[in-house]
Amino acid sequence: RDAQESRGLGDVYKRQMCMARQSDGVFYLRLEDTDKKREIEHGADEIITSLAQYGVCFDEGAAADGEAEKGSYGPYRQSMRKEIYQTFAKDLVKRGLAYPCFCSAEELDEIRKAQEAEKADMGYYGSYAKCRNLSIEEIEANIKAGKEYVLRLRSDGNAENKITCRDLIRGNIEMPENIMDVVLLKSDGIPTYHFAHVVDDFLMGTTHVIRGDEWISSYPLHEQLFRASDLKMPKYAHIAPIMKLDGGENKKRKLSKRKDPEASVSFYSKAGFPVQSVLEYLMTIANSNYEEWRMKNPDADMSQFKFKLEKMPVSGALFDMDKLASVSRDVISKMSEETLFDEISVWAKDNDEKLNAYITASPDKFRESIKLWKYNGKKVRKDIAKWSDLSEMFPYLYGDGVDGYEFDEKLTADERKAFLTAYISAYDHKVDSSAWFDGVKAV
């Protein structure tokens, strides 16, 4: 399953790893929109459209605004599943595994200050959980008095005990049990992410959850919630983030949507990297054996590669723009002239006004011009890594022309004209560079 997140390169990277289609399963989108402060307007539209261009399509789940959801396990927006979560929460209360907490913000702040003074772990747990052992009479009195409350898990964890997360990428990870009496339902009856995640993954039949490694620390809580609710837990794979080198000391850091323009998928669209190039590159950093497979299967569709989670990097793949460009040159070199025409035409409409005008006015000339940079004689060239390279590398074809060239002062205007006329007459774009140079010398 896939939860609502941002539309960055890392998300395309993560969703490329989805094993649903290789296992005849279902890949679905669930919008986790219970936190209205963080909700993104038209979030479903952005997720679906931005990822669709990279071939990431959902089999079922939440749909774009105004469209009907697909699938039998909806609604797929958590804000529409409030009563479902409350039913599961009620069962936990009946079994003594959850309780109402009436602590005010001021009381919670006092607990925090006491923990700071005592240098204790922060949180609502153990002796610091003031409402944990309230009697039924006290609870009823508080509710009748109109006191607001949240519903908390009654944790049975012990910090001295260890649990094992059997991660599909990292292997077994030992961690202390959860001891926190976390909030399950907020005062408005809306669930927290952690509780909704457990209920929905069970009801929607989730078998595998693939998520970022920042969620590893939440595993003990999720394990406890699944166990308390007597629900089968899915398998987890925690993916390390894409990294980049930062500064002169070559320090690695996480690729950031705030700092790095290349972290956004729109960066690649605007630059003109073909979708297939980006996906091909991401696979080279996602699975250590992909490049070897590609060498043996140069013309095979990427979907034929058997992706393995255990082959993913544990420490985080290093993003390399030069490597992306190299991969993209290979991808573009294999495109037919017709495919090149179609892809460049679509890209130019939104990203290169002059090139678009040229293609629109002279489509046949543009088709012919493709041959000039695609071939060197009979050999296929690998000069172009992205569509924006065209105007930069071939301004005499698609840009403003070549400015500022100065002939030798010894040449008269007539001699210059005679040279250009002879060169044009002798030029043959079908010959290779060696034959071309011999022709220039002859002129």
Model-derived segments and their meaning:
Residues 31-38, 73-81, 210-212:
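Conserved short loop/turn motifs at secondary-structure junctions
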Residues 44-76:
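A glycine-rich helix N-cap at a beta->alpha junction
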Residues 37-54, 227, 255, 274:
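Glycine/small-residue-rich interface belts in oligomeric ring/scaffold proteins
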Residues 229-413, 417, 424:
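Catalytic adenosine-cofactor/nucleotide-binding cores of aminoacyl-tRNA synthetases and other
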Residues 91, 99-100, 104-238, 243-255, ...:
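Active-site cores that bind ATP or allylic diphosphates and position pyrophosphate for catalysis
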Residues 2-10:
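Single conserved hydrophobic/aromatic residue that forms the stacking wall/gate
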Residues 10-24:
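Histidine-anchored nucleotide/phosphate-binding helix
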Residues 51-58, 93-100, 112, 119, ...:
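A generic secondary-structure signal for well-formed alpha-helical elements
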